[in-house]
Curated annotation (Swiss-Prot):
Subunit structure, as described in the record: Homodimer, also forms heterodimers with GRHL1 and GRHL2. Interacts with LMO4.
Disease linked to the protein: Van der Woude syndrome 2: An autosomal dominant developmental disorder characterized by lower lip pits, cleft lip and/or cleft palate.
UniProt-annotated location(s): Nucleus
Domain Grh/CP2 DB stretches: 226-460
Organism: Homo sapiens (Human)
Gene that encodes it: GRHL3
Pfam family, one: GRHL1_C
Official protein name in the record: Grainyhead-like protein 3 homolog
UniProt function note: Transcription factor playing important roles in primary neurulation and in the differentiation of stratified epithelia of both ectodermal and endodermal origin. Binds directly to the consensus DNA sequence 5'-AACCGGTT-3' acting as an activator and repressor on distinct target genes. xhibits functional redundancy with GRHL2 in epidermal morphogenetic events and epidermal wound repair. Exhibits functional redundancy with GRHL2 in epidermal morphogenetic events and epidermal wound repair but is essential to form the epidermal barrier with TGM3 as critical direct target gene among others.
Length: 626
């Protein structure tokens, strides 16, 4: 567009209602004021001139000065030059009233046109002196009037009748629309910010153009779909973003929340070298195989000792109808494993929940969580001999409450910052693979493993091993059918027998049978500690004899005083949990008749977990050495 500015003639009629196609307003002022919603500041003009948009500056300056000023001081400017005319005519203005009475008659109109139309190609100085509108903003050189080539005017060629204003209540839509066309603004997709100090910022909305791509990208080399396998397992949780190269995919889970695990065959069970359509799969939560079995069992025992109940399992299966519609014979083979049978011709789905946190395997606070593996082993059990045919794993980290969702959001924010810092780095392909983990993918594929020889480490506490044997979930029973059991079940018993607790653990478990007593003589005020090797009357007599030098056979009467003050002969077997009427946890008892040795009270402690004396049960007793 040239630097020359055209103006179309604007015809204003008295009491004209609005009849525009795109802008419906009650008056002309509202229409233009709405169009000029932002003030035209000096900074805005300067920025538009820098962008080479002088024509828009001139046009907007004209509209703003006209419609934003007082109504009684507006200038009526008329132009007769078209947009394609080489010659331009500029006219003087005149003050007008709101009703435009002088322009209603043809005589006044012709007089106005003949007095104000000038053929001079330069701007007259009278416009500035009379405070009329100046068009210096549209000139290439500010402050100097640029001469324009003379050309024919429409006023000279047209007839007088063409300029007569008819008495009508409608706007001339063509004249106003032509003014809109002469203003070259920004495209509709961009918003013009007058006070912005930036020239343009089109890259801000396209910081991550690869995320918005709809074309499928090739999966990462570590992804399971890129590998050919007879079985395909998925976990209904989003895949973690930050995964080291060569590691299994990782998913974040919430403790106690159930997630779907889907098992299927890509070919619908066709082409599989199986003896039957039904296979048995074992879903288990295990540690990485790099940890030796002894260390893994030590971790599980540490976790189990901190649980509120001994029946707490590592992995649970949801009791819902969808599980029983696709799988059958669900069995809890260990505390960290469960098995079921499913048909390879159909898709199987079970809902599992993990009840341990990644930080439950250390007594220290603030340590990094230990990642676990969700492992699925599938056995062919059609001909009576079970054979491991497939294994797949994925890493899982378990958080409390809604920690899994928070961890995913934190990883996404870190990934975004990394993309902003190095958008054109050489490892953009790797980052694209990382970003593909959360592009609408709410499942995590388990990666197939080639190692089918290493047996899994299953955790079965010693206190419940016998019950598992009775239920047929741990060790094979004697008989001809024992050889038909799964290899997994046959390995449960050897694991428990082979990896017994360490010798230090055995010694500490023996110390649990010991009892610590506090006794004193009748003349003493301070109690002395007395250790009983066995929690019975014989152990008490033996300890008193060793500490105070009394012959053990001389201690033949031992009394106990109940809370109600009653005294009775102590049973030869000291109970580790006395009845409530024998509990007294405050002060030693008073003197009892026929008490010749002294008094004391029962105080028991766990030597393994707490080295400091802690009162568990208190029992007052009296020893008579007569």
């Amino acid at each position: 567009m040239s630097n020359e500015l055209d103006f179309r003639s604007v015809r204003l009629l008295k009491n004209d209602p609005v009849n525009l196609q795109k802008f419906s307003y009650t008056s002309e002022d509202e229409a233009w004021k709405t169009y000029l919603e932002n003030p035209l500041t000096a900074a805005t003009k300067a920025m538009m001139r820098v962008n080479g948009d002088d024509d828009s500056v001139a046009a907007l300056s004209f509209l703003y000065d006209y419609y934003m000023g007082p109504k009684e001081k507006r200038i009526l400017s008329s132009s007769t030059g078209g947009r394609n005319d080489q010659g331009k005519r500029y006219y003087h203005g005149m003050e007008y009233e709101t009703d435009l009475t002088p322009l209603e008659s043809p005589t006044h109109l012709m007089k106005f046109l003949t007095e104000n139309v000038s053929g001079t190609p330069e701007y007259p100085d009278l416009l500035k002196k009379n405070n009329l509108m100046s068009l210096e903003g549209a000139l290439p050189t500010p402050g100097k009037a640029a001469p324009l080539p003379a050309g024919p005017s429409k006023l000279e060629a047209g007839s007088v009748d063409s300029y007569l204003l008819p008495t009508t209540d409608m706007y001339d839509n063509g004249s106003l629309n032509s003014l809109f066309e002469s203003i070259h603004g920004v495209p509709p997709t961009q918003r013009w910010q007058p006070d912005s100090t930036f020239k343009d910022d089109p890259q801000e909305s396209m910081l991550f153009p690869d995320i918005l791509k709809t074309s499928p990208e090739p999966p990462c080399p570590e992804d399971y779909p890129s590998l050919k396998s007879d079985f395909e397992y998925t976990l209904g949780s989003p895949k973690a973003i930050h995964i080291k190269s060569g590691e299994s995919p990782m998913a974040y889970l919430n403790k106690g929340q159930f997630y779907p695990v889907t098992l299927r065959t890509p070919a619908g069970g066709k082409g599989l070298a199986l003896s039957s359509n039904k296979v048995k799969s074992v879903v288990m939560v295990v540690f990485d195989n790099e940890k030796v079995p002894v260390e893994q069992l030590r971790f599980w025992k540490h976790w189990h000792s901190r649980q509120p109940t001994a029946k707490q399992r590592v992995i649970d299966v949801a009791d819902c109808k969808e599980n029983f519609n696709t799988v059958e014979h669900i069995e809890e083979v260990a505390y960290n494993a469960l098995s079921f049978v499913w048909n390879v011709n159909e898709e199987a789905k079970v809902f599992i929940g993990v009840n341990c946190l990644s930080t439950d395997f250390s007594s220290q606070k603030g340590v990094k969580g230990v990642p676990l593996n969700l492992q699925i082993d599938t056995y062919d059990c059609g001909l009576g001999t079970e054979r491991l045919v497939h294994r797949a794993v994925c890493q899982i980290k378990i958080f409390c409450d809604k920690g899994a969702e928070r961890k995913m959001r934190d990883d996404e924010r870190k990934q975004f910052r990394r993309k902003v810092k190095c958008p054109d780095s050489s490892n953009s392909g790797v980052k694209g693979c990382l970003l593909s983990g959360f592009r609408g993918n709410e499942t995590t594929y388990l990666r197939p493993e080639t190692d089918l020889e290493t047996p899994p480490v299953l955790f079965i506490p010693n206190v419940h091993f016998s019950s598992l044997q009775r239920s047929g979930g741990a060790a094979p029973s004697a008989g001809p059918s024992s050889s038909n059991r799964l290899p997994l079940k046959r390995t449960c018993s050897p694991f428990t027998e082979e990896f017994e607790p360490l010798p230090s653990k055995q010694a500490k478990e023996g110390d649990l049978q010991r009892v610590l007593l506090y006794v004193r003589r009748e003349t003493e005020e301070v109690f002395d500690a007395l250790m009983l090797k066995t929690p019975d009357l014989k152990g008490l007599r033996n300890a008193i004899s060793e500490k105070y030098g009394f012959p053990e056979e001389n201690i033949y009467k031992v009394y106990k005083k109940c809370k109600r003050g009653e005294t009775s002969l102590l049973h030869p077997r000291l109970s580790r949990h006395p009845p409530p009427d024998c509990l007294e946890c405050s002060h030693p008892v008073t003197q009892v008749r026929n008490m010749g040795f002294g008094d004391g009270f029962w105080r028991q402690r766990d030597l393994d977990s707490n080295p400091s004396p802690t009162t568990v049960n208190s029992l007052h007793f009296t020893v008579n050495s007569e």
